[in-house]
């Protein structure tokens, strides 16, 4: 039987007080490797605590922490889904070959999760196995359904379901674990709200699937008024573990994997997925909103011909793409699942909070802030910006996120990438400009190199360790959740903080670091691609580009004349397109210091400023740059840009050597580019002359 302590904390007879957690994982594309690393270390820390309790170790907290819910969008959904399966079994942790004395020797705990995020999804496979640039998905004349070979992700999903080991439930995971995965439903679901005098019709494309995973854990969870009455599909871990071979994989788990891949189906880049469900799932669906839905909830207005009613169900299928397109931060689903009495918020005070949402957000770098006069008043530039604006707006959730940032809130936490090199004795710690290696190309960059993804996985583990030690805390004098007298001090776990009102408060970690979770996770070495690997990458991209373009021309056009014209355009424009892609890749790799062969000249200049100028010179939109144009792009002072350009001009023979156009008149601004990008002889000869209008000439940002 369950009983409540006088302070309201849910307890079980004969057990300790419980602190409940839920994890929300944001969309991240290839930076999902970071979220996976965070989850990996969290499982390691909770395992180590359970082991210490079983061994009777002293000075441990007198309460338990339990995992009740997960939610994810895009890469976050894939991480949550595979993480749940990985947590159902036990693999021996992988270790570093030569760990530093006193540092963490464990490389990863959840091998299935590591392989899914680090080993498998890559643009260029080092061993020749199928990768994201392979052409196997186009074999046999099949049509193009995505720019990249999404068969790789299908294979990852299939491998994740190969849970042939023994099911080993974890004591700190709910026996009925709620998992929400976000979907972008391209078909849409119609709704109507009735008013006096009429009705308002609308369509939602923000969809989700809700699974209740049975048997991954043994903790009998407390009731969830929101999730327990929401439409959810129960799925048993026992039906997966022990299954052997593709033919015996349970269909409900195949649907589970398909939903996770659908949530991660980035539009155009990765193939969409078809989700098969039924209208009854929507009749019971609840929304994480502040209105009470106990007696009234929105009901879809399906077509009359379907004859949908309380007793009549109807099959409903739809095409789904990236769930992060509409809801990239599914924080609210976990928050409502943890609520005792929704929509009333949980207790937030550090002395009373007994449940919390942990949000994993892999992209700490916000969207760029446009300068004056941007975007230009052109049709294409406005169209591009409208799409970006809509996407950024749906991610703007001040009502949810402001509460996370509030100083006194201890029921909502966020962990995001921070790359801070260990300081030398007496030195000052300084966070690096770029935290994750997967951040380039809008998040696709992690697929460039396995070392990029491994770096982010290890950074996730390191950041999680610091987060558990310093940020996931409660007041030392919490009403119901206590450490033994003096235990936190003996473990050197007390964190003293000065609040904005000047008062000093002592906090203790909610999850203690003990056993193999205590040694420091090593600082991962920043990963770089070598020039040969980069050249191979560009070559493989070109092969995929040409194959996809030719297949599109073949399957999407019926006119022979049109096919001939498009193939001719591909022939004459191929080199220009490939060069644009090469420069775009190189621009970001150089700016983020993620490619070898680009050492900077010795100078008293900040390296990240120098790389920003180099990136501006590599911008494929311009052939020649002015000091003012570079300053506008980099947000650096013009005098600093001039100093950097002068320094780079002296880097003879280096990739970073700058070239100054010799034809510039004294009354015009100087023009710069890299030596490797000098205009051709013809373009140089015709620059500024009227015949140049008949030929392609360099693009210059004179204004």
Swiss-Prot record:
It is a multi-pass membrane protein. It comes from the Bacteria. A motif (DGA/G) lies at residues 322-324. Keywords: Cell membrane, Hydrolase, Lipid degradation, Lipid metabolism, Membrane, Plasmid, Transmembrane, Transmembrane helix. GO terms for molecular function: hydrolase activity. One of its GO terms (cellular component) is plasma membrane. InterPro entries: Acyl_Trfase/lysoPLipase (IPR016035), PNPLA_dom (IPR002641). The active site is at residues 74, 322. Residues 23-335 form the PNPLA domain. The chain crosses the membrane at residues 23-43, 69-89, 143-163, 250-270, 357-377, 432-452, 644-664. Its main location: membrane. SUPFAM superfamilies: FabD/lysophospholipase-like (SSF52151). It is found in: Cell membrane. This is Uncharacterized protein y4iI. It comes from Sinorhizobium fredii (strain NBRC 101917 / NGR234). The lineage of its organism: Bacteria, Pseudomonadati, Pseudomonadota, Alphaproteobacteria, Hyphomicrobiales.
